[in-house]
Amino acid sequence: MVGVRSFRPADRAAVRDISFRTGFMGESAESFWRHKESWADLWTSYYTDQEPEALHVATMDDAVVGYLAGCRNTAGMRPSTEELTKAVIRRHWLLFRPGTAGFLYRGLFDSMRDRERAGGDFIDPHWPAHLHIDLLPAARGTGLGAALMRRWLQQLEEADSPGCHLLTLVENTRARKFFEKSGFRIHGNPTLVGGMRGKRGERLHQQIMVWNLLRG
């Protein structure tokens, strides 16, 4: 049996685990970030702890195999992504950990040389909401991703939200096609992602995509 439902506190560990296991274009983030707890803090703690009503999970035989983490008002996030990132770096001593320091210092170097690069939160009143979505390999191609997306966009429609945005990697073609099929479109030009590299050492690019509520 497969299905989607609202997040429950008991799902927190599974959501954190999935975020790490799918953190690099659907594969494990371990290739560049070898500290699971700090990764999960960065990418899931706001949603599980501050806005759980906007978090939805996908299940197979009652096991959580994916999630969609939403935020209805990015401008109102407390802490903001930048504040959260700084706090997690301090709390876990990430600048001194062998499994994370290289990525962070490479990102700092990239930020000094890149004129156009991926920044912090995208704030625009036309698309105030945002989302992250991650599925384990076994859940892909089952319709669960589409079901999660429909559930989240319906929640935004019921709240009369004007729109939603997301950030994805240009190089993640499967994800981009899924988002386009879900009604998202490209907004603006891609920007370089600091610190991150592809499997062959190439630079990666971030793309903003947006969805608008269609009013009758």
Go through the PLM ranges and name each one:
Residues V57, A63-R72, R117:
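Conserved beta-strand in the GNAT
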Residues A75-H132, M196:
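Conserved acyl-donor/pantetheine-binding loop and adjacent beta-alpha core of acyl/acetyltransferases
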